[in-house]
Amino acid sequence: MDSYVTVDPSFHSPRISLEILVPTKYAKLFTLKQLSRMLALSCKHRARQAANPVSKRTSRDRNGSKTMGQGPSAVAPQVSKGHNQQVDGGVCLAPVKSKRAVRREKRRTAAKKATNKAKTETKLVKKGGSSIHAPKAPKRTSYLSSLLSSPSGAKAKMGALSKPPQTKNAPDANEGGFTLTAITPAECRAEARRRFHPITGSSRGPYGFCTRSREGCGVCADCVEKKAHLDFNRSFDTIGTSRVIRVDSMMEEVAEDLASPSVLEPSGFWAPAEKQAPSGEGHSRRRCDVVTLARVTPVLRMLRKVDPTLVDNRLLWEAAFRTVFPQRKCVYPHGCFCDRG
């Protein structure tokens, strides 16, 4: 089936024989002149390829051309049927990048972008220096503090470029940005009973008496406030908690463009110990599951960013939970704070 073609002697080269074996389908397609031109071009291309240094991954076939382990080795110049015939006989010798080379190029560009981004990122500079109130690193870090500062045990892999954590704007717990204090429910009730709001600092008036009925109508502002206060106090008995973890943020001087709620959490932001971590005191305690907290916490931050006035923790928790889990009837995973289901 194959036919021998004798090449014009003007294309002589000491390394290449005068006769090339051309498949019959190509011999029918092209004239002798075109075939000889193809041979000359392929020789040039082979020489050009041979000049390039061979990487470890590539190997050479018998003809000296590089093979990447993909497709047949380049023994003869292949012509695709459907293409329009070119001047050189339909052979396009433009160097085509292999899939691996394309992937390598993509990886390099991504790495360059990442390094450039890391260079341009600005860090939060504190004017006050190291804080006096910086607490000692706790033996058992609570779940909230592990959200705020990445744990020291988890080291990023050398080669892998990991995404920056979502909490990167939050101050480090060990730098005095936050103090985690465990207080008793009695202390928490006492704080709630104070006349000024622990977060906003605005003074709260005393609970008024319902003007409509002696028992309380349950509709007016005074009744609503009184009921919320009673529910809050009763919540400690419902959960059966022994400690409450209060998170105080140290108010530091921060540049005005950084003074956003994501950078400085409101002071007095506290959460029941159930939402934190296992107590480790021997007795198991019902607490919010970690998945729930991990899904709700970013929403809390977003809500606080949208509306900084929405700092009351209970309101925030409920709003975030409704956002994340709209199908659940009750906001709290282990039953409600109040008794109305």
UniProtKB/Swiss-Prot annotation:
Residues 142-152 have a biased composition (Low complexity). Residues 97-116 have a biased composition (Basic residues). It comes from the Viruses. Residues 46-175 are annotated as: Disordered. This protein is encoded from a satellite RNA, called RNA3. Belongs to the nepovirus protein P3 family. This is Protein P3.
